[in-house]
């Protein structure tokens, strides 16, 4: 994989360039300095090799500010792991002392280095290019990230430096011919889907993918999300402080554990709109829900020393809304004294209907207690979500439930379930064919869902019952 790091002092347009290169808005862009605090990871798609772009925070080497020291450390780490470095400056300001200091740090790394003179919005701005060579970097390109100007030229220069070949395009005629052949092979001319009974239509899990499992860490500010990431990875990847909202962007972190790849999405804390005081915090809050939608599995981090808050319940309802498998991580467990873990979990389950259906793991990021169980819990949950429940097992389970608690008689009729299938895994859904929807009460539907949940260990997996009426077949 080719890795490209974007570096520079604050407010020169690094995040705008990052978004242009990745062709999506992954980094928050704002005129306020220090918007990007952690390393952000994106990818350039459509190249012949995998390409990762690393956006780093604005570097101020001499600052005594607590955050700036962390940002400087993160930026150097990003430069260290990259193959190609992009030093971004504001061409309207020329070469500043900060720009020169950063270049002095990067040149000894002996890596391909491009000086990207950003904010060259007009031809007049580009007239000052010759003045930039005094910084000691031979490769200089002018761009305007905000106007999408010369970005393609920059990408082509990166390809040249990295010796990346272009992808040969397949002729349109060959693609169309292949599509026509494939469509004819689906069914023979004598067959159609109507020839098959619904019972015979099989639903199987998708083929195994080598893509990383996307894990979103969700939670209100200051519950320890970044501490958990750093504890899992044994590396300080996310800036940590006791000020709520330290992480503003969603930070993508790729990690391999036991031959499996995980993409952790460390999110900004989600807050009620009343507490969102500026545009950056609002964008961060909205991105939390986007991270939920993007993830394969969500880890909801709560503070074990506090009661479940309305924020926590709101986040959990968002996870349920998006039908995402999830695990609740009760962090700061080391601060709980005199309470047995099973009693805490039991009491926590009783506080909210969604909590009662969730998987719960008590951990301590500060003491690194039970962190090793997070990976095994993720793997177990993913395996449960990925499997297909055999149709005979589904029907046997529901038949047993009907026998155990008979549905009530309504207008002289009783509910009958002819058959059921596990229809889809993402989202998890069962399809039931019954005699009449009017005979399935909400109470009894809840009973059937609880039966399926306990029988197939579907805790932490929101699922639905799709109900279809099927008239009794007469010969």
Swiss-Prot record:
Q: Where is the KH-like domain?
A: 387-471
Keywords assigned by UniProt, alphabetized: GTP-binding, Nucleotide-binding, Repeat, Ribosome biogenesis
Q: Which family does it belong to?
A: Belongs to the TRAFAC class TrmE-Era-EngA-EngB-Septin-like GTPase superfamily. EngA (Der) GTPase family.
Q: Is Repeat one of the keywords UniProt gives this record?
A: yes
Taxonomically, the superkingdom here is Bacteria
For the keyword Repeat, the answer is yes
Which named protein is this?
GTPase Der
Q: Which GO terms describe its molecular function?
A: GTP binding; ribosome binding
Q: Where does GTP 1 bind?
A: 8-15, 55-59, 118-121
* Quaternary assembly: Associates with the 50S ribosomal subunit.
Gene that this polypeptide is encoded by: der
Binding residues annotated for GTP 2, in chain numbering: 219-226, 266-270, 331-334
Task: Please explain the role this protein plays, according to its UniProt record.
Answer: GTPase that plays an essential role in the late steps of ribosome biogenesis.
Q: Which residues form the EngA-type G domain?
A: 2-166, 213-386
PANTHER family to which the protein is assigned, alphabetical: GTPASE DER (PTHR43834:SF6)
What processes in GO biological process is this protein linked to? ribosome biogenesis
